[in-house]
């Protein structure tokens, strides 16, 4: 699973105890939180002994009574004992993200600053493809040397 930072929120799916949940990837959250309205009624929960900070004022905060089996977005095996409260969407915190091997990368530019300026002046929008409808190739392709020395591609 990969997500480029954009106007869209980075959400992904996880399967907890066989039930699928969608949640927001939240690197600022220490723990994962399941929305109270999505928590299955037959799954045991208990009043949390600690409160949640950073999500506003949550009047009812629970925690799963059990450590639950979880499969990440690419079937990474993990376990979680999520918090449960009234929030609009589930949050995948660092407790799960670390187990899933999540990374944040900021790749070095593929092109020189000069070529980037030229492309921007010509109307190129990063993340969009080239062409009239911006639907062309979005990532550079890798040139391959013709090892059989046939046709174009063999360096003389």
From Swiss-Prot:
<feature type="domain" description="G-patch">
    <location>
        <begin position="111"/>
        <end position="156"/>
    </location>
</feature>
<dbReference type="InterPro" id="IPR051592">
    <property type="entry name" value="HERV-K_Pro_peptidase_A2"/>
</dbReference>
<keyword id="KW-0068">Autocatalytic cleavage</keyword>
<keyword id="KW-0814">Transposable element</keyword>
<dbReference type="GO" id="GO:0075523">
    <property type="term" value="P:viral translational frameshifting"/>
</dbReference>
<keyword id="KW-0064">Aspartyl protease</keyword>
<feature type="active site">
    <location>
        <position position="26"/>
    </location>
</feature>
<keyword id="KW-0645">Protease</keyword>
<feature type="domain" description="Peptidase A2">
    <location>
        <begin position="21"/>
        <end position="96"/>
    </location>
</feature>
<keyword id="KW-0378">Hydrolase</keyword>
<dbReference type="GO" id="GO:0003676">
    <property type="term" value="F:nucleic acid binding"/>
</dbReference>
<dbReference type="Pfam" id="PF00077">
    <property type="entry name" value="RVP"/>
</dbReference>
<comment type="function">
    <text>Retroviral proteases have roles in the processing of the primary translation products and the maturation of the viral particle. Endogenous Pro proteins may have kept, lost or modified their original function during evolution.</text>
</comment>
<dbReference type="InterPro" id="IPR018061">
    <property type="entry name" value="Retropepsins"/>
</dbReference>
<dbReference type="InterPro" id="IPR000467">
    <property type="entry name" value="G_patch_dom"/>
</dbReference>
<dbReference type="InterPro" id="IPR021109">
    <property type="entry name" value="Peptidase_aspartic_dom_sf"/>
</dbReference>
<dbReference type="Pfam" id="PF01585">
    <property type="entry name" value="G-patch"/>
</dbReference>
<comment type="similarity">
    <text>Belongs to the peptidase A2 family. HERV class-II K(HML-2) subfamily.</text>
</comment>
<dbReference type="InterPro" id="IPR001995">
    <property type="entry name" value="Peptidase_A2_cat"/>
</dbReference>
<dbReference type="InterPro" id="IPR001969">
    <property type="entry name" value="Aspartic_peptidase_AS"/>
</dbReference>
<protein>
    <recommendedName>
        <fullName>Endogenous retrovirus group K member 8 Pro protein</fullName>
        <ecNumber>3.4.23.50</ecNumber>
    </recommendedName>
</protein>
<dbReference type="GO" id="GO:0006508">
    <property type="term" value="P:proteolysis"/>
</dbReference>
<comment type="subunit">
    <text>Active as a homodimer.</text>
</comment>
<keyword id="KW-0895">ERV</keyword>
<dbReference type="InterPro" id="IPR034170">
    <property type="entry name" value="Retropepsin-like_cat_dom"/>
</dbReference>
<dbReference type="GO" id="GO:0004190">
    <property type="term" value="F:aspartic-type endopeptidase activity"/>
</dbReference>
